[in-house]
């Protein structure tokens, strides 16, 4: 059933932005199906955005996105989180404002006068989230995929958190756990990562994170596994800069990846074999046929496009042979000329064969017609000669009879 998301802005309280930058967040919860798109200030904030993978729990997805901005610009300047869920035709805009006090006993003074707000009263206790491995790590044998368990809103008074990991209900002890202090609300965040085997994830094994803390009435368990379903390989198309762009200082290449399922995919760019960093991907979008598509745009200076031999769009997806497909576009004049000539020759040959076929057909028809006419004339002349000869030839038999 299609379910629109609920959107919650996550912002520090007044007085907690003491550093040079501040991180703002947007929690998108309770939607189905995938996917959603999160933009900040209509896309003008993009360089410091981090989007976390979606988590499926109880048939609904939850994901989050964060952006880091200079503390000198917020909250004096507006920051807005925009969430679009195409499947439900839902668009939600949330303005990020300093969070007000949770406790009414010791309220926070206005931000202009505030130096340090009291720590929030975390009556609800810690929250636990589990995240799947990066798809590139899963599909590349040289990398190590990891499942991540994140515990947030841990009180500084009871910071001890016990995290246990299970694979198909068998406990494992290879996880690495780190603790971080969240300055914006004076809480503890605990991150535990479990290295896993590639085949364990691909085969659908279940990974469980079990968390316990004094502020929890009972342990919290979160499970995750690879979503089962039809696997469809993507089709990849790489598009050169439009002709109108070539007169400008900057140009862009586009990689269109369509028709794939599931939605987990990795797209990267290289030029002459070297990794490119200046590109942006859309989130996978659910198409009308149930498959997904994605756009990736590589930006560069026009001079680089003119000087570089080739650019490649590298796609990794479980539906591909060896999980990998590379599409390359070349700026080499020789190669470009060959491609153009090849296409022109194909067109010329098609036209030439058509002309030759028509000519041969007409020639054979003409020969047949001429032969038929000639044969008819010869037959007519021969018949006339025979008839004439019969008329003028003397009747020697009668002549002999008369002589006798």
UniProtKB/Swiss-Prot annotation:
Transmembrane segments annotated in the record for this chain: 351-368
UniProt keyword list: Cell membrane, Disulfide bond, Glycoprotein, Immunoglobulin domain, Membrane, Repeat, Secreted, Transmembrane, Transmembrane helix
Annotated ranges, domain Ig-like: 5-97, 126-225, 234-330
Transmembrane helix listed as a keyword: yes
GO BP terms in the entry: complement activation, classical pathway; humoral immune response mediated by circulating immunoglobulin; immunoglobulin mediated immune response; phagocytosis, engulfment; phagocytosis, recognition; positive regulation of immune response; positive regulation of phagocytosis; positive regulation of type I hypersensitivity
Cysteine disulfide partners in this protein: 26-81, 149-209, 255-313
GO MF annotation terms: antigen binding
A Pfam family per the record: C1-set
InterPro entries the UniProt entry points to: Ig-like_dom, Ig-like_dom_sf, Ig-like_fold, Ig/MHC_CS, Ig_C1-set, Immune_Resp_Modulators
Record's comment on post-translational modification: O-linked glycan consists of Gal-GalNAc disaccharide which is modified with 2 sialic acid residues.
Gene Ontology CC annotations of this record: extracellular region; extracellular space; immunoglobulin complex, circulating; plasma membrane
Highest taxon above the source species: Eukaryota
Glycosylation sites per record: 104, 185
The UniProt record lists the keyword Cell membrane: yes
Topology Cytoplasmic: residue spans: 369-404
PANTHER family listed in its UniProt record: TAPASIN
Name listed for the protein in its UniProt record: Immunoglobulin heavy constant gamma 2B
Organism, scientific name: Mus musculus (Mouse)
Gene that encodes it: Ighg2b
């Amino acid at each position: 059933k299609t379910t629109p998301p609920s959107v919650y802005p996550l912002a520090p309280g007044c007085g907690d932005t003491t550093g040079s930058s501040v991180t703002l967040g947007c929690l998108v919860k309770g939607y189905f199906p995938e996917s959603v798109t999160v933009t900040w200030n209509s896309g003008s904030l993009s360089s410091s955005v981090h989007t976390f993978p979606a988590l499926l729990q109880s048939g609904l997805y939850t994901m989050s996105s964060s952006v880091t901005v200079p503390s000198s610009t917020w909250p004096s300047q507006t920051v807005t989180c925009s969430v679009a869920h195409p499947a439900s035709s839902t668009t939600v805009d949330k303005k990020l404002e300093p969070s007000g006090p949770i406790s009414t006993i010791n309220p926070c003074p206005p931000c202009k006068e505030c130096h340090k707000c009291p720590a929030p009263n975390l009556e609800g206790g810690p929250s636990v989230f589990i995240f799947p491995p990066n798809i590139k790590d899963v599909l590349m044998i040289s990398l190590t995929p990891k499942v991540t368990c994140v515990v947030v809103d841990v009180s500084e008074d009871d910071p001890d958190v016990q995290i246990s990991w299970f694979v198909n209900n068998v406990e494992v002890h290879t996880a690495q756990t780190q603790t971080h202090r969240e300055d914006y609300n004076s809480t503890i965040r605990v991150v535990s990562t479990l290295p896993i085997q590639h085949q364990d994830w691909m085969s659908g094994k279940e990974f469980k994170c079990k968390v316990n803390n004094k502020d929890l009435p009972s342990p919290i368990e979160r499970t995750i596994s690879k979503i089962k379903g039809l696997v469809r390989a993507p089709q990849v198309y790489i598009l050169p800069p439009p002709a109108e762009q070539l007169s400008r200082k900057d140009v862009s290449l586009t990689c269109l990846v369509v028709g794939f399922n599931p939605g987990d995919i990795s797209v990267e760019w290289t030029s002459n074999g070297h990794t490119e960093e200046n590109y942006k991907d859309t989130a996978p979008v659910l198409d009308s046929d149930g498959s997904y598509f994605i756009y990736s745009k590589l930006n560069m200076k026009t001079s680089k496009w003119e000087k570089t031999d080739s650019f490649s769009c590298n796609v990794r997806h479980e539906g591909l042979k060896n999980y990998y497909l590379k599409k390359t576009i070349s700026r080499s004049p020789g190669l470009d000329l060959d491609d153009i000539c090849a296409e022109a020759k194909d067109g010329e040959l098609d036209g030439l064969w058509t002309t030759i076929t028509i000519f041969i057909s007409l020639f054979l028809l003409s020969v047949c017609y001429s032969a038929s006419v000639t044969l008819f004339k010869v037959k007519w002349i021969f018949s006339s000669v025979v008839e004439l000869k019969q008329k003028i030839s003397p009747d020697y038999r009668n002549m002999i009879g008369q002589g006798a």
